[in-house]
């Protein structure tokens, strides 16, 4: 087993209630938020133009290689009808530590009012990952969503792709026989 890695956190993460400026390019939607842990920061956008707001862990967690855990964030939200939130992995955690969100992206429906929890997985084969309360662990992306009116038909209309599915466009030579 490798040395324990600490993923770190931004300065003043615990207890800060910094709200970053929203880019004028993006529209805004009012999202009510309930802070279940008063010492943790609210989700925030790190940079203007960012699509995802950082979520932090409400607890200390150590994930052994290959281990998964559902981690509390200390917040609950109320999305307006017609919106959903999607929980995405943080690219730096995935690239540097092998830490990812198991069901990426996780979906938070507009009607859900419970605590947002993030199912994390340490994909590193040898090194445990240490998360300290207040560490940024995932990103929350709020999106407008449409509801489908499903209409059963006997045949589907044609398309250029047709029924081509997994790997139908090629793009790699893995497993191909060489002559």
Curated annotation (Swiss-Prot):
Cofactor or coenzyme needed: Mg(2+)
Enzyme Commission code(s) on record: 3.6.1.23
Keywords: Hydrolase, Magnesium, Metal-binding, Nucleotide metabolism
SUPFAM superfamilies, per database record: dUTPase-like
Pfam families attached to this UniProt entry: dUTPase
Signal peptide positions on this chain: none
Gene3D superfamilies to which the protein is assigned, alphabetical: 2.70.40.10
A GO BP entry: dUTP catabolic process
Residue numbers binding substrate: 90-92, 103, 107-109, 117
Reactions catalysed: dUTP + H2O = dUMP + diphosphate + H(+)
Gene Ontology MF: a single term: magnesium ion binding
Family from the record: Belongs to the dUTPase family.
Protein name: Deoxyuridine 5'-triphosphate nucleotidohydrolase
Native source species: Thermobifida fusca (strain YX)
Native organism taxonomy: Bacteria, Bacillati, Actinomycetota, Actinomycetes, Streptosporangiales
């Amino acid at each position: 087993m490798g040395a324990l890695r600490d993923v770190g956190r931004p300065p003043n993460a615990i207890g800060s209630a910094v709200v970053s400026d929203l880019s004028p390019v993006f529209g805004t939607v009012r999202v009510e938020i309930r802070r279940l842990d008063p010492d943790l920061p609210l989700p925030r956008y790190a940079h203007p133009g960012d699509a995802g707001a950082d979520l932090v862990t409400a607890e200390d967690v150590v994930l052994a290689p290959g281990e998964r855990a559902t981690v509390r964030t200390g917040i609950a939200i109320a999305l307006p009808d017609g919106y959903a939130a999607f929980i995405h992995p943080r690219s730096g955690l995935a690239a540097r530590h092998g830490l990812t969100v198991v069901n990426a992206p996780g979906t938070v429906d507009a009607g859900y009012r419970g605590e947002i929890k993030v199912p994390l997985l340490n994909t590193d084969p040898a090194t445990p990952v240490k998360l300290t309360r207040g560490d940024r662990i995932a990103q929350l992306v709020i999106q407008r969503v449409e509801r489908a009116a499903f209409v059963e038909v006997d045949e589907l209309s044609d398309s250029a792709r047709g029924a081509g599915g997994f790997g139908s466009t090629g793009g790699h030579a893995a497993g191909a026989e060489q002559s």
